[in-house]
A protein has these predicted regions:
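Short, small/polar-rich loop/turn modules that mediate ligand/substrate recognition or access, typified
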Residues: 95, 181, 186, 244-246
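Conserved glycine-rich cofactor-binding loop
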Residues: 15, 22-24
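Substrate-binding pocket helix/loop in short-chain dehydrogenase/reductase
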Residues: 105-106, 113-118, 214
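Residue(s) in the substrate-gating loop at a strand-loop-helix junction
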Residues: 149
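Active-site helix of classical SDR
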Residues: 129, 165, 173
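Alpha-helical segment proximal to the catalytic Tyr-Lys
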Residues: 134, 178-182, 242
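Conserved glycine-rich Rossmann-like NAD(P)H-binding loop of the short-chain dehydrogenase/reductase
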Residues: 38-52
Length: 265
């Protein structure tokens, strides 16, 4: 019997929930899953974002099911997961993508600011995973993909809460893989580098010191795009990654591998 590698990457018949998928990275991942054959559900927090997202999905030929849901609200998340299961079937693929960043020097950051980032970027992934895992366990298979960051590995000024949250998300990923791997659950992470999204717009102005710094530190010598994450996300959601567990796949243009150019040549 011939082995068809293309079938390993198919998501036909799968149900995927992508949090924070109204635009940017989440939207690109949801679109990739739809292109690979999955049924798509997503959430966002405002009606304005929902209306635009549904119009964008429709324009791209995708029938997406949208929910206005605060992913830090356990009751709302459980209700969303139950509704998805009733309408689309058991959730096979969960992408914990919802997140925020606050760029504030640590000594100027309030505890409230710190907690808000932790709640949305880390605690929400725990809440949504906890709501979705029982269905995956009943079905005997599931994929959880946590959108981590290159800042899961390294620090940088003004983003103490974000690095703490993303470092924690990396370890939550490994723990879920360790705890449920024997029940055919694969939990992995994607660690984007600096991606051209609305969150990074203030840093991407040509001539901005950080823009020039980033290009000098990235072997690919460019900002990433949401589309750069589509292939890796499909891989981690597909049967092709069934023996990959607890791994963080960094999609960063090589920045974590690069110490910098020797000024002496």
């Amino acid at each position: 019997m011939m082995f068809d590698i293309t079938k390993q990457f198919s998501l036909v018949g799968k149900v995927a929930l992508v949090t924070g998928a109204a635009y940017g990275i989440g939207y690109a991942i949801a679109k990739a899953y739809a292109d690979a054959g999955a049924k798509i559900a997503f959430n966002c927090r405002s009606q304005a974002h929902m209306d635009k997202a549904l119009a964008d999905y429709k324009k791209d030929g995708i029938e997406a099911h949208g929910y206005i849901c605060d992913v830090t609200d356990e009751e709302a998340v459980r209700a969303m997961a139950a509704d998805i299961e009733q309408k689309l079937g058991t959730i096979d693929i969960l992408v914990n993508n919802a997140g925020i960043i606050k760029r504030i020097p640590m000594l100027e950051m309030t505890t409230e600011d710190f907690r808000k980032v932790i709640d949305i970027d880390l605690t929400a992934a725990f809440i949504v995973s906890k709501a979705v895992l029982p269905g995956m366990l009943r079905k005997g298979h599931g994929k959880i993909i946590n959108v981590c960051s290159m800042l899961s590995e390294v620090g940088r000024e003004t983003v103490a809460a974000y690095t703490a949250a993303k470092g924690g998300l990396k370890m939550l990923t490994k723990n879920i893989a360790s705890e449920y791997g024997d029940r055919n659950i694969q939990c992995n992470g994607i660690g984007p580098g600096y991606i051209a999204t609305p969150q990074t717009a203030p840093l991407r102005t040509p001539g901005h010191p950080f823009h020039e710094f980033l290009l000098s530190k990235t072997p690919a010598h460019r900002w990433g795009t949401p589309e750069d994450l589509m292939g890796p996300a499909v891989f981690l959601a597909s049967d092709a990654s069934d023996f990959v567990n607890g791994h963080i796949l960094y999609v960063d243009g090589g920045i974590l591998a690069y110490l910098g150019r020797n000024p002496k040549g």
